[in-house]
Every structure is written in structure tokens, then in C-alpha cells.
Amino acid sequence: MSIRKNLTYNTKLDQLDGYQDHAAQGRTQEIASHALTFMAIGVRKAWKQPIAFYFSGDCVTADRLAVLIKEVLSTCFGAGLEVIGVVCDLDGVNLRAINLLGSSKDRPFFDHEGHEIVTILDPPHLLKCFRNNFLKHNVQFVQDVQIEGQRRIGVAKWSHIEEFYNIDKTNPNFVFAPALTQQHLQPNGKQKMKVRLAAQVLSHSVAAGLLAKVAQNELPQDAVGTATLVSNLDKLFDAMNGDTPDRKRGKQYLTNMSSTSPHLDFFNEMRVFFTEMKFLGARSKPPSQDGWLRTMNAIERIFKNLKKYQINTLCVRRLNQDPLENCFGCIRSNCGCNPNPTSVQFIAALKTSIITNLINNNKNRNCLDDNNDILNNFKVFLHKGEQTTNDASSSTPFPAEISIEGVEELDIPQCSGEMQACAYVCGFIAKHMAINCAQCKTIMLADPNTEVCHLFTSFKEYDDVKCSLKYIQPSFCEMVENA
């Protein structure tokens, strides 16, 4: 975390605070500009705990960072913790440090005092860096894509996403990708650091929208390659963020990793995909390309190593830096209107954050809630009370007859993007309604893939065999459009 350069006289220790301080490795006369922080995260249980921090100058060397990593690992093992891996982002110093320790792309682990330590690169950071490279270069990949009746090499272009957005936003009421804005397509320097923007543009909704526009000849046929790349990245990001034993929103990869889950087979498929990938016009291979390969190998290695502890499922969501990022957000919020604290302010804010359970109420944070409880806050302040549940039954009378006759017919063709997006939204609402009445089902629901207005909905399905979405009658969609 970046901190403000500042020197403060410490009357208690009779010294100036604010210099680079690496504890046992000594202090230097370089003024600190970063707080190098280590946090322990539970793999089996949802807990977190800040365990160490050091103050560094503008650039800590890779060999020094490697020494600090080993110091922290030794302390953790000495305290009785069984460390199985370390997580870091794509910063060059981090990569050089773990390489010095013995980790590599194909063997993402090193030995420390007889313990195997797996090295993982932060998946949200990988997605963000990949998007930044995709902004500048077309991506070629050796995955067959059907174009004009022939099998060809796929080429993904950012311009296809821009064309899709410009077409999609012309719909008056409903769109295929409502989250997309100009910030997603042309992010500035600060916006390029936002993981949310990268995840929303490289999403299943955008991939489905691209395919729907290609099917209606509103986008060129080679945009199928772009949809393939976007879809694969969405699935891979899901596979590295699963935190429940069941599917979330029907997404088959957004689950815990197990021997019966599709993760291992999908990782094998993605290894080929990323190995043969090329960023056209780039001088060298971007670090994020090998980073995905390294992280897939690392997650698979951890899953294998956990079996010796009789742990057969892995919550992959815990193998990222979100808890640490949320800790930094909590520290900044505890500094009031000063988001760039000095070293002294950092220490005070960290203490406050730990005592208050690392609660981060900042709405503009760069990651999701990690749902981990702090292991030791030194004092318990809050107690959760019992939650009360409302009776789900309702005495509101329901009319025996429902009629949508007389609804004014709109001049919106069923094949239009507007009607397709409306049909998907109506289906989304119907999916979250408890429709047990046979008459209501007849009025509202249609058979899958029987109406042209359901083209986008069919592309939104996560499973090609089993339909999990609701398909609404076109007449009902027209009533919603007219409302």
C-alpha cells in the first residue's frame, strides 16, 4: 500500500519514524513510501488476520522481499499455522522474488524448511492486466471458431465490443449488457485499475450479446472469435472465484473445486488456449498470459496437496488478495479524508481496523466483500441477534382469471435487440417468482427456443443441454414494453 513520505519524531523510542524499516533486516536512510503488508487467510475456515508489515522505499529489491517472505513463513510455522501457499499480484518485484525462491510457471511452488509453498498470482489482478493488454492488441488463439461455414483460427478484437455497445445502447428500454458504459470501453488511467470494469466487460452477458448480434448479422461473423475469448475469460474467472458448494446464478464454474466439479477438465482446456495465444503487434508476451497458466497450475497443486489433510473440496475464492485489499480500504477509511497516510498514521489506522474487525464500508472499493472474519480482534464489541423471519404466506386474493387482451400492440419486431433484451429481463423476474399456478404458467411461459425473441436468452444459458432460464410469452413481453 502506498503511503506518504514523512518523518516524525518518536519520543518514546527517541528516533525518527518514516524511514525504510525491514525489522530484523534493519533500517536505512531511504524515506518509506510503501507499507509492505502480510496477511494470513484460512483455506478451510473463513478467517483472516494481518500478521506483519514493513515500511519500504520506492523500490524494494527482489532478494530482500524473498528474505522477508521466508521470515514471515518461519514465524507462521512457529506459531502453529500450516501454510500451504502465498498470493501476490503481477508486480515485477513480486514475480522476481518468488522466482528466486524456486517457483516457476510449470512448477509454481518452492520448499521452505521442508514445507511445500505454492505461489498463486491474484486472479482479479490477472483479469485487469489482461483487459489492459486486450485494449491495445487483437488476440489470436488456436481454438476453432466457425466462421462462414469454415473452421478458422479465432481472432478477438476490442473493436467488436465497442460496435456491440454502440448497437446495444440504441434500444429504448432494454439492453443486452446494461452494466456497460463508456468507462468500460475507454477507461482512463485510474479506471484501468478497477477490477469491476474489467469483470463486467469480459462477462457472459457481453459474450451472449455478441453472439446474438452476429446471428442477426448486426456484427461481422469474425466477432464470434471475440465472443469466444470473452466467454472463456468469464468462465476462468468464475472457476477461480467459487465459494459455495452449489452453482451461483446457474454458473457451473462458480462453485467450490472438487473431484466431481468441472474445474480440472476446464483448466486443461484453458492451458492449451493460453499457451497458443498471441497478442498481435505486442513486442513480447504479456505477463498476464503466463500468469493465468501459472495460477491454474498453482490452484491444481493446492487442491492435490490438500487431500493429504482429508480435504476434498477447495473454496477457490479464498486464494486471492481481496481480504488484503479490503484491509487497505479499511485503513484508508480510518484515516478520514486522508487516503494517503504517513507511516505513523498507517500504524494507528491498522490498529483501529483490527479492533473494529476490519469492517470496510467504502462503497468505491476495488474488490468484493471477502466474507472472512478476523481471527483475533483483541476485543468483541458486536453480537449478532437472532433473526426473525416473516410468514411467507399471504392472504391477498388472486384473481381467478388473468387476461392480457386489449394490450396495445407495439411496433417492435420480435427479432429486435429491444424485444430480446425485454424477454430476458421478464424471464429473470419470472425465475425469481414462485409461480405454482398452472394457468399463470400457461399465460406467462413459453417453450424454450420456439420464439425469435428468445435468441439472446438462449445464448445466456450456461448449459447447452439443460435449460435453467425462463422463456416468456411474446405477448407478455409486449405488455411489459407498453407499461
Located regions from the model:
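Acidic surface patches and DE-rich sequence motifs
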Residues: 10, 44, 111
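Structured nucleic-acid-interacting core domains from mobile-element enzymes and related host factors
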Residues: 1-39
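Non-catalytic regulatory appendages
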Residues: 27, 48-483
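Short connector loops/turns at beta-strand edges and beta->alpha or beta->beta junctions
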Residues: 3, 42-48
